[in-house]
């Protein structure tokens, strides 16, 4: 198993903290986001990591290549990171993702390492880390059936307050089998971009595939674990209170 980390974004809402560095280089309690994530992956047995870089990509590439010489670190460039979204960053790593089962992670997260281990050790070939809805959650939600199969993806514009107790937030960490990636997901992403462009989210394709029954995706609950997604300086302050 390998990991793909999406780290091309600008992180403009973090202000001066990302003036000269990629978003994932921001420290949380003295540890950079990207260092925390790579160390957790290494402790979980992952040795090959593909990082998709964009904003301040050369600085990030040089930093990681020098720091993690004991690992198989590979880099993919998104030269148009400022006019595309993460669906395109993911697609740029498609040749690597055809080689092995893959963990897909976004680089602006702090998580408990046990969340990664639960995902890796799950017998499900294709799975997503999810967390019961909380008021601070933003972005895509999912619903699940009694067996923790994800039954729908719900974009923010389609939220219904009365249904919030049924919602789970996607943590933005997934496990995909090589077969699913090669036979289904990557071709679907390519077709989606040809039809609708490159400025969208990879979860939109998962949404459509789930609705049409093209994927069986298991939800792995992060209930009881600490995690946070960092988009703003306010998020950073919260993250520093809840993680070591």
Residue ranges and their predicted role:
Residues 1-3, 167-244:
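Conserved alpha/beta core of the MobA/IspD/sugar-nucleotide pyrophosphorylase nucleotidyltransferase superfamily
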Residues 1-19:
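N-terminal nucleotide-binding beta1-loop-alpha1 segment
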Residues 2-5, 31-100, 195:
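Conserved N-terminal catalytic core of the sugar/cofactor nucleotidyltransferase
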Residues 20-35:
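Short catalytic helix/loop segments, enriched in acidic residues and glycine
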Residues 24, 72-74, 149, 216-218:
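Conserved beta-strand segments of alpha/beta enzyme cores
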Residues 25, 142-144, 219:
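A structural signal for short hydrophobic beta-strand segments in well-ordered beta-sheet cores
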Residues 65-146:
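Conserved beta-loop-beta/alpha segment of the NTase-like Rossmann-fold superfamily
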Residues 112-192:
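Conserved core of the sugar-phosphate nucleotidyltransferase
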């Amino acid at each position: 198993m390998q990991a793909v980390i999406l780290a091309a974004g600008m992180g403009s809402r973090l202000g001066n903290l990302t003036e000269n560095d990629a978003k994932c280089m921001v420290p949380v309690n003295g540890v950079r986001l990207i260092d925390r994530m790579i160390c957790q992956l290494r402790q979980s047995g992952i040795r090959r990591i593909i990082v998709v870089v964009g904003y301040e990509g050369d600085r990030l590439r040089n930093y990681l290549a020098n720091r993690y010489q004991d690992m198989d670190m590979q880099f993919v460039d998104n030269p148009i990171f400022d006019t595309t979204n993460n669906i395109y960053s993911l697609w740029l790593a498609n040749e690597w993702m055809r080689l092995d089962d893959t963990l897909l992670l976004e680089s602006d997260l702090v998580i408990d390492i046990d969340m990664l281990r639960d995902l890796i050790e799950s017998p499900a070939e294709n799975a997503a880390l999810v967390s019961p809805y909380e008021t601070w959650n933003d972005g895509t939600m999912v619903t699940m059936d009694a067996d923790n199969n994800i039954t729908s993806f719900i974009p923010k514009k389609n939220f219904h307050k009365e249904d919030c107790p049924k919602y789970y937030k996607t943590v933005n960490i997934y496990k995909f089998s090589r077969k699913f990636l090669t036979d289904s997901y990557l071709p679907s992403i390519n077709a989606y971009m040809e039809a609708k462009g490159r400025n969208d989210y990879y979860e939109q394709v998962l949404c459509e595939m789930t609705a049409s029954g093209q994927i069986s995706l298991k939800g792995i609950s992060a209930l009881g674990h600490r995690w946070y997604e960092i988009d703003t300086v306010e998020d950073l302050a919260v993250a520093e209170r809840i993680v070591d």
